[in-house]
């Protein structure tokens, strides 16, 4: 699928490719070497001499309509008389090429060199790294051009900064061909000019290539503008560069990193959006910003080699930004507050809230506090909208007095600048509407209460007023007037008990006032906002409890009077009672199966007695009773009987 889009322009070398694996900093990666065997170089180079070549620093965007799914993509190379460091590698993998390398994204101006997601050189494998060249993508300028300033000399094993060595005829022909295209020159002259760049002395080529390198960058830029090529190529070319300043001749194989990524092509069939996980404050996101930075740095094209020489020995380009250039770029972007445009089209089915993400997250780093505050205002306004709906709650006392200030606060919050201003304003309107609804319910409810009070008969307990605002608990508990205590039941419009477990428990009620129910007003002062019918039930229950206490006290007084009227029996009369010996267990003594005083059955060997009224008891039980009261415990007959 789409393999024809990534076929090499030139046939594969007959010598084949060599592959090896290496270990970098604890992580294992596969490195592919594209250098054919030494014996096959001349034969491969001779096959390439007659082919007309496309400039190696540029790739055609219209050529890639489909992408290869292989993580190790096919490449386009040109092998000539010797190893050419100007050859390019196109990474066409969709999964590995959507994201630009970190250093590539961080380069705001045209850099001499960049690298893409490769490991740091460790101390233990510095020789291994310095032995072979590293394949790296050239930095893309803000006009979409890729610049190379690092050349690798396979014969010397070192990077050439001044110019191409005598064996770099392919690279020299590319520069000459590009300059000849700007001027209408026959093809024969182009071929003849290439022959001029065949093997020369190393000193002469190095002294003359310094201007050619700058000319290559300028000519490629002019050719870009003349042909109106898009600023986003479909493939990111990768140039072969040296791995160290002083490399040995033993290991010269160029290494290709499979994890190098390039920007997504505008010709993709299904564009996808991606969110940068790295710190991308230095990455220019719009084409205009790329072009502006390129124009600012137009005079620095000759500084590519200088930046290349300023690199570390391991071959890493250090990000060097002039302070004035960074400040100018920050001043250019920050006042605009324009959301950054991604280089790929957004898929509407992939991220639903991508606009909000761009709105709050894609601005500069100094705007983080603004969108956090906006989200907080939106969240608070949503809470106020939910809490201010007075139609679904029972109207509570004092709420109508405190609702207008809350509505004003919500409205003032809504007028504050920010994305959540409209939501806050809507919340304030909802709060005011809730307060108006509460006032309307109160006005409708008050006349009905007055009519019911007027129709009460004498002796009935009136419904307690709960609209009075002079109670002490209302002034102390501001949050308790709008939220009910779970223990104190909440009633709806029909006075039906409802259990709402989500209400707050901040309500503090002085439950000691429940002890003062003599007049039924203590609870009304403590919880005056509770439904009056509920308080009526509580008052009735308290009245019944008081009546029971009065009845019990009366019965006790009657018992005392009886005891006073019946004095205890004399000791002689108690001893004169007859004794009856129980002969069998659980046997009936007289008509009784058990003693009425201790309620226990008669057991064999116990002593029972009979009173003159013919009631039987245990003699010890009835003796104690008669010492307190001279009556029968069952029938209250006098003992001893009167004469």
Swiss-Prot record:
GO biological process terms, semicolon-separated:
protein catabolic process; protein ubiquitination
Question: What are the UniProt keywords, alphabetically?
Answer: Metal-binding, Phosphoprotein, Transferase, Ubl conjugation, Ubl conjugation pathway, Zinc, Zinc-finger
* Zn finger (RING-type) start-end: 595-636
The molecular function terms of the Gene Ontology recorded here are:
ubiquitin protein ligase activity; zinc ion binding
Instruction: Please give the residue ranges the record annotates as the region Disordered.
Output: 1-363, 380-454
Per the UniProt entry, the Enzyme Commission number(s) are: 2.3.2.27
Fetch the SUPFAM superfamilies from UniProt.
Answer: RING/U-box
Q: What class of enzyme is it?
A: transferase
- Which tissues does it occur in? Expressed in various regions of the brain including the cerebellum, cerebral cortex, medulla, occipital pole, frontal lobe, temporal lobe and putamen. Highest levels in the cerebral cortex.
Residue positions, PTM Phosphoserine: 265, 365, 367
Q: Which Pfam families does the entry link to?
A: zf-RING_2
Q: How is it modified after translation?
A: Substrate for E2-dependent ubiquitination.
Biased-composition ranges, Low complexity, are: 200-209, 410-439
Q: Can you state which reaction this protein catalyses?
A: S-ubiquitinyl-[E2 ubiquitin-conjugating enzyme]-L-cysteine + [acceptor protein]-L-lysine = [E2 ubiquitin-conjugating enzyme]-L-cysteine + N(6)-ubiquitinyl-[acceptor protein]-L-lysine
Q: Give the UniProt entry's GO cellular component terms.
A: cytoplasm
User: Gene3D superfamilies, per this entry?
Assistant: Zinc/RING finger domain, C3HC4 (zinc finger) (3.30.40.10)
Which InterPro entries does the annotation name? Znf_RING, Znf_RING/FYVE/PHD
Q: Which CDD domains match?
A: RING-H2_PJA1_2
Residues forming coiled coils: none
Where is the PTM Phosphothreonine found along the chain?
Answer: 277
Here the segments flagged for biased composition (Basic and acidic residues) are 95-105, 145-158, 173-183, 213-227, 289-310, 320-362
Q: Which PANTHER family match?
A: E3 UBIQUITIN-PROTEIN LIGASE PRAJA, E3 UBIQUITIN-PROTEIN LIGASE PRAJA-1
Task: State whether it acts alone or in a complex, and with which partners, per the record.
Answer: Binds ubiquitin-conjugating enzymes (E2s). In vitro, interacts with the ubiquitin-conjugating enzyme, UBE2D2.
Query: What information about domains appears in the record's comments?
Result: The RING-type zinc finger domain interacts with an ubiquitin-conjugating enzyme (E2) and facilitates ubiquitination.
Q: What does this protein do?
A: Has E2-dependent E3 ubiquitin-protein ligase activity. Ubiquitinates MAGED1 antigen leading to its subsequent degradation by proteasome. May be involved in protein sorting.
Q: What is this protein called?
A: E3 ubiquitin-protein ligase Praja-1
Tell me the name of the encoding gene.
Answer: PJA1
């Amino acid at each position: 699928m789409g393999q024809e889009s990534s076929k090499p322009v030139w046939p594969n070398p007959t010598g084949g490719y060599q592959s090896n694996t290496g270990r970098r900093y604890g992580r294992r990666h596969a490195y592919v070497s594209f250098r054919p065997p030494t014996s096959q170089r001349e034969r491969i180079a001779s096959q390439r001499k007659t082919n007309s070549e496309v400039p190696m620093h540029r790739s055609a965007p219209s050529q890639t309509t489909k992408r290869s799914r292989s993580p190790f993509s096919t490449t386009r190379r040109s092998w000539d008389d010797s190893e050419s460091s100007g050859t390019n590698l196109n990474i066409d993998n969709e999964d590995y090429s959507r994201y630009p390398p970190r250093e590539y994204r961080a380069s705001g101006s045209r850099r001499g060199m960049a690298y893409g997601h490769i490991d740091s050189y460790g101390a233990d494998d510095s020789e291994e790294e310095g032995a072979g060249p590293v394949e790296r993508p050239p930095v893309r300028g803000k006009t979409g051009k890729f610049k190379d300033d690092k050349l690798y000399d396979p014969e010397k094993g070192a990077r050439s900064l001044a110019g191409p060595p005598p064996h770099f005829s392919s690279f020299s022909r590319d520069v000459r061909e590009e300059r000849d295209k700007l001027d209408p020159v026959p093809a024969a002259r182009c071929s003849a000019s290439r022959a001029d760049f065949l093997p020369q002395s190393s000193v002469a080529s190095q002294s003359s290539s310094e201007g050619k390198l700058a000319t290559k960058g300028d000519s490629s830029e002019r050719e870009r503008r003349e042909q109106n090529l898009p600023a986003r190529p479909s493939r990111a070319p990768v140039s072969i560069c040296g791995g160290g300043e002083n490399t040995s001749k033993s290991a010269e194989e160029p290494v290709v990193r499979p994890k190098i990524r390039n920007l997504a092509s505008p010709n993709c069939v299904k564009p996808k959006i991606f969110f940068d996980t790295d710190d991308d404050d230095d990455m220019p996101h719009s084409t205009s910003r790329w072009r502006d930075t390129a124009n600012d740095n137009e005079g620095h094209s000759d500084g590519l080699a200088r930046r290349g020489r300023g690199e570390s020995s391991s071959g890493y380009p250090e990000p060097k930004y002039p302070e004035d250039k960074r400040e100018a770029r920050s001043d250019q972007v920050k006042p605009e507050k324009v959301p950054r445009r991604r280089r790929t089209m957004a898929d509407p089915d992939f991220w639903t809230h991508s606009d909000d993400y761009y709105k709050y997250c894609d601005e500069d780093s100094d705007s983080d506090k603004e969108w956090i505050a906006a989200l907080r205002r939106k969240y608070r306004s949503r809470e106020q909208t939910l809490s201010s709906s007075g139609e679904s709650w029972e109207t509570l006392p004092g709420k109508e007095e405190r609702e207008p200030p809350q509505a004003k606060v919500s409205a003032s919050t809504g007028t504050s600048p920010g994305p959540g201003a409209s939501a806050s304003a809507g919340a304030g309107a909802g709060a005011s509407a809730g307060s108006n609804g509460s006032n309307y319910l109160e006005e409708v409810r008050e006349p009905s209460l007055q009519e019911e009070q007027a129709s009460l008969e004498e002796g009935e307990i009136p419904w307690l007023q709960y609209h009075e605002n002079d109670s002490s608990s209302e002034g102390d508990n501001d949050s308790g007037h709008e939220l009910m205590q779970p223990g104190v039941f909440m009633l709806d419009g029909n006075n039906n008990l409802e259990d709402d477990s989500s209400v707050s428990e901040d309500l503090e009620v002085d439950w000691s006032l429940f002890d003062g129910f003599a007049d039924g007003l203590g609870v009304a002062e403590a919880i005056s906002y509770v439904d009056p019918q509920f308080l009526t039930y509580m008052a009735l229950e308290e009245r019944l409890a008081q009546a029971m206490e009065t009845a019990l006290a009366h019965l006790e007084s009657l018992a005392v009077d009886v005891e006073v009227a019946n004095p205890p029996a004399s000791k002689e009369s108690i001893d004169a009672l007859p004794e009856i010996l129980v002969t069998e267990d659980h046997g009936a003594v007289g008509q009784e199966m058990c003693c009425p005083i201790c309620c226990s059955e008669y057991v064999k060997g116990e002593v029972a007695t009979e009173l003159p009224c013919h009631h039987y008891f245990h003699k010890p039980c009835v003796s104690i009773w008669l010492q307190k009261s001279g009556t029968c415990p069952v029938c209250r007959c006098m003992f001893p009987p009167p004469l």
